[in-house]
Amino acid sequence: MYQPGILGRRKRVCKPWTVALTTTAALLALAVLIGLLVYFLVYEEKTHYYQASFWIPSIKYSSDLSEEQSKLQINLKQKINNEIDVIFQRSSLKHHYVKSQVVNFRPSNDGVKADILIKFQIPRKNADTLRSEADSILNKKLQSSQSFLKRDISLPYLREMNAAQAEHILNSNCGLGMEYPRIARIADGKPAGSNSWPWQSSLQVEGIHLCGASLIGSQWLVTSAHCFDNYKNPKLWTVSFGRTLGNPLTTRKVESIIIHENYAAHKHDDDIAVVKLSSPVLFSENLRTVCLPEATFQVLPKSKVFVTGWGALKANGPFPNSLQEVEIEIISNDVCNQVNVYGGAISSGMICAGFLTGKLDACEGDSGGPLVISDNRNKWYLLGIVSWGIDCGKENKPGIYTRVTHYRNWIKSKTNI
């Protein structure tokens, strides 16, 4: 008996040109893959970080060098960074040198010692010779009588550092944010730039944004005391970092909340608190501290400042997911204390900012957030903390902020910052 045929099945025969085409395509794909692999292993640039130590015999160590943002520290750091910039920008590594940064000053019996972090980007194929080449360049230049820097022979010259630790150090300087000026308004619903305000954080309860805060140290925030009127237990709070609330850069739990001893919920004075995080954050281009001004810092009326936050875009309006910013002006306390403005309610611990014409202002949900000003070196300082006001953007009712300089010593007493 014959076996019945299987319906629809027949033998396929590949034509020679089909086999050739398939083989060629496979070989081409393999060649591309090998090419990419070779490029990655040989030509792709890799970042390298080296720590170097130098001796400066011409300068005597002073306690001012350990004081953050002191004039002596700022000037010496800039002088050293400029010297390293010139050395490498005029060398065979000029296309691979990225930047340098002074990490620390140390006392020496005969001068000052400085620890410096140097960043390079170089193809992988040349990575093996980078350290020796950089070492040779530095040695040659520093032996010159024109250089005020000398090699610190007590330590290995160039010590490689891992990327995470190095980036943390490179971004540890305060106040590095938006390049001023830039125009955007909370009232228009325009979001802030991606790395504009890297100290801004969100204080949340059960994942809901309630207040803003500013990062002033790897484990410390400063914010408004009234943010904790209803929720005083630190365990209820979490902190979110990053430009968007829905996709945070990182989060932390809260270890403790320190509210100013004289704060009372029924008044606006002493509206300041500091928050200690459960663990330190790792600094990056998107996560940095804002600078704190000294208690003697003065700001003039009409000075341009920025306030940022995730507050309502207008009175009783929607809340954004992306961080918003608005540029406003400092208004003197005398003007804000006029009868038709706030009628004497503004104390020396407060600062007034906005416009008497209204429109541009902080709003509900911005409480605790930063009011910042830029200096001539493009460093941003925390002038105020969003505290209170009447409505949002109302005529003759500008925003009122806690004056940070007034509480500078209090902040230092609680955080050692």
UniProtKB/Swiss-Prot annotation:
Where, subcellularly, is it found?
Membrane
Q: Which residues lie on this side of the membrane: Extracellular?
A: 44-417
Instruction: Kindly report the protein's main subcellular placement as a broad class.
Output: membrane
Please list the residue ranges annotated as the Peptidase S1 domain. 186-416
Annotated transmembrane regions: 23-43
* EC class (word): hydrolase
- Give one GO molecular function term: serine-type endopeptidase activity
List, from the UniProt record, the residues annotated as the active site of this protein: H226 (charge relay system), D271 (charge relay system), S367 (charge relay system)
The SEA domain sits at 46-165
Name of this chain's protein: Transmembrane protease serine 11G
User: Per the UniProt entry, what species is this protein from, by scientific name?
Assistant: Rattus norvegicus (Rat)
